[in-house]
Amino acid sequence: MEKIHKKPTALQAALAVLTVLVSLFAVCFLGFFARWSLMNLGTPGGSAAGAESSLALMDKYDMYITNEISEALDGVFSVEKVYWLNDYDLVAPEPDQSRFGSSSDPTELQWLLDDAAQLLGIEKFIFHTGIQLRPGSEVNWYLDETIFAITWQEVKNYGVYTFSEVRIAHPSQMRRFLAGGTYGYDKQFVTTQMACDVNAVVASSGDFYKFRNYGVVVTNGQVHRANGAVDTCFIDDQGDLILVKRGQLNNVEQAQAFVDEHNIRFSLAFGPILIQDGVRCEPYDYIIGEIDENYPRAALCQVDSLHYLLAVANGVSEYSNMPTLHQFAARLEEMGVQTAYTLDGGQTGVIVMNDRMMNPVQYGSQRQISDIFYFATALPDGG
């Protein structure tokens, strides 16, 4: 039966607006008082841990107020909702399983692109309905008001490329998770397990920071290690990738000053940089990554604001030709990305969606690693 919506009277509309305004005043007052208390009274102990706890609590209050205001305004004013996540929360909201889907026929998916464009304001897609899928593979996707993710496989130069295109509504939906939830944890896990643990919509293996001592490692704005031997990919509070060439940040003080100045949330340290400002710039020598060998590759790319592409190249069965680094960079350039940064490939390079591995992994199985980065829904659990 179709629902009939009656137009509210002027008195009903006025009362609704008054109710919202009173609610907003109460929420904002309580949030202001809570922040004032934390800043002036602090947490017990006065330690650095206490200070960090205060910051985390203030972030939670900010997130609560923003989400409550969005809910209060819904249906009264024509105002776009804004949902965001707290960086200090280890687990993201659980995605709504009914919003996942799959198809073996890309030509049937124009409706999906249209819906994603309307919900998230996407003007340009990497995925299109004319894509030639790897034989026997499927397109997998997730769509809600805060995230669109679509994953597929193609064959290029007799090798398999797995791509996952992601558009999020808020920068906080792009996140990093360290095994054990803390820096330096002594155990490692496969990417699929960590992705499941944090409720990722889409996840990628990270830089495997515990395997080597290179690079600048940052989580939640704090520098843990600063070795400038490799290029670093920083993710700022706007969700943009900021790429820094090797040799520019060589100690913790330098790195922390850079992090503070640019509002950096976290980093990835592997490299090299492949594309910057839409121009290929991969080096011809690098300390890691088997540049000139045919090897499994992985990369994080940015298309435009809050719009990303994950890429993994593997060899499997009759499609066994893996790319050199330069061939990989050329393929990403063809995709039209503005920024591309190399991640740990080989047996490490994995893309996960809905807790399932999306790409064939070299040498038979996933490697246990120390970290992932991932994209999450910002809607409350279950959407």
What kind of feature is each model-predicted range?
Residues 179-184, 248-250, 313-317:
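Short, solvent-exposed aromatic-acidic interface loops
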Residues 185-188, 251-258, 293, 319-326:
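A short, polar/proline- and glycine-enriched secondary-structure boundary/capping micro-motif
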Residues 159, 171, 239-240, 302-309:
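Beta-strand-turn-beta hairpins that frame and shape the catalytic cleft
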Residues 214-235, 281-338, 343, 348-383:
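Conserved, well-ordered active-site substructure
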Residues 2-232:
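Zymogen propeptides
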Residues 207-286:
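Active-site-adjacent helix-turn-beta-strand microarchitecture at beta-sheet edges
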Residues 159-163, 197-198, 269, 295-297, ...:
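Extracytoplasmic
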